[in-house]
């Protein structure tokens, strides 16, 4: 078989990326920027945030923070299963996961992937992991499970069919994980179910927000779940674009106009943004501090 020869510019790019991954300054700089950026967004939106009716929004805000942490914790578990297929290196995987959560907020989702690769290369050079492949698998399964959730709201039959299709795809993607202690099929079913729970959590948060601004029979959990799954899956699909973060906002706005008054759509989008930014900042910081304490206690 004839080998495909890559162009010189692509070889140079790959070489520079590898050098970048191994540079501790790059991962540190990216971590700092990932914290500054969401804080800046919150600061720029401070006038709108202060105008929120916190007397009624506070309860939903606090409940959403708790639900969000459950979802974040489950996604952290799934990440460890995807990259290792087991929990023997769960703490180191968790450290990388929470350290790079905020990088998803940076324009162009590729920074999240680059940050992960760089941290694994710098902090855990002796632990062999297929980070790039795992990033892709995580991204693809998240989109597929989001579509599974959406199809369930249209028809249970479509939901079941798409569920087994997603399990089959996930099993195929994980089949070469020779170090896995769990059979690929069992691992795939676990991952898909855990991600569906995460999608349900997002739908619940949106449902609380919608019922807070529009107490009508039109707003149901099923509708909220469908809107959340479809809008978020679309934004994940287009995450690589600089305006990827805004795609979910536009998708949410388009899908919510039939459920609530147009004047309240922007309010819900702002509330979603505030909850997610605050939750990412708070829970990632708290989790990293806990992991540091755990690491210190485990050190002889």
Per-region residue spans from a language model:
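Predominantly cytoplasmic-facing regulatory/coupling regions of multi-pass membrane proteins
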Residues: 1-98, 144-240, 247, 252-300
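Extended non-transmembrane interhelical loops and adjacent amphipathic helices
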Residues: 94-121
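Hydrophobic alpha-helical segments of secondary membrane carriers
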Residues: 100, 129-135, 268-272
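Alpha-helical architecture
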Residues: 105-106, 133, 244-247
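Residues at alpha-helix boundaries and short interhelical turns
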Residues: 106-110, 241-242, 259
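Transmembrane helix boundary and interhelical loop/hinge segments in multi-pass membrane proteins
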Residues: 110-116, 245-252
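Hydrophobic alpha-helical segments and helix pairs
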Residues: 119-152, 159
């Amino acid at each position: 078989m004839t080998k495909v020869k890559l162009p010189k510019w692509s070889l140079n790019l790959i070489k520079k990326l590898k050098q970048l991954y191994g540079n501790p300054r790059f991962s540190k700089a990216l971590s700092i920027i990932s914290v500054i950026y969401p804080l800046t967004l919150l600061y720029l939106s401070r006038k709108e945030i202060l105008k929120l009716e916190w007397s009624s929004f506070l309860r939903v805000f606090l409940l959403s923070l708790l639900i969000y942490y459950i979802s974040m914790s489950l996604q952290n578990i799934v990440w460890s299963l995807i990259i290792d297929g087991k929990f023997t290196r769960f703490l180191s995987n968790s450290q990388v996961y929470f350290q790079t959560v905020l990088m998803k907020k940076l324009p162009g989702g590729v920074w999240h992937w680059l940050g992960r690769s760089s941290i694994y290369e710098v902090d855990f050079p002796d632990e062999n992991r297929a980070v790039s492949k795992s990033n892709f698998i995580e991204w693809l399964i998240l989109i597929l499970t989001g579509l599974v959730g959406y199809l369930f709201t249209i028809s249970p039959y479509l939901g079941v069919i798409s569920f087994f299709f997603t399990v089959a795809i996930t099993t195929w993607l994980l089949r070469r994980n020779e170090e896995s202690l769990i059979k690929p099929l069992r691992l795939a079913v676990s991952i898909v179910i855990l991600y569906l729970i995460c999608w349900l959590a997002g739908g619940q948060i949106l449902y609380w927000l919608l019922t807070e601004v529009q107490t009508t029979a039109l707003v149901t959990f099923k509708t909220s779940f469908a809107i959340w799954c479809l809008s978020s899956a679309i934004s994940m699909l287009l995450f690589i674009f600089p305006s990827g973060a805004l795609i979910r906002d536009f998708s949410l706005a388009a899908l919510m106009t039939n459920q609530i008054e147009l004047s309240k759509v922007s309010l819900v989008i702002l509330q979603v943004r505030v909850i997610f930014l605050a939750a990412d900042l708070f829970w990632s910081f708290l989790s990293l501090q806990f992991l540091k304490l755990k690491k210190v206690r485990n050190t002889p």
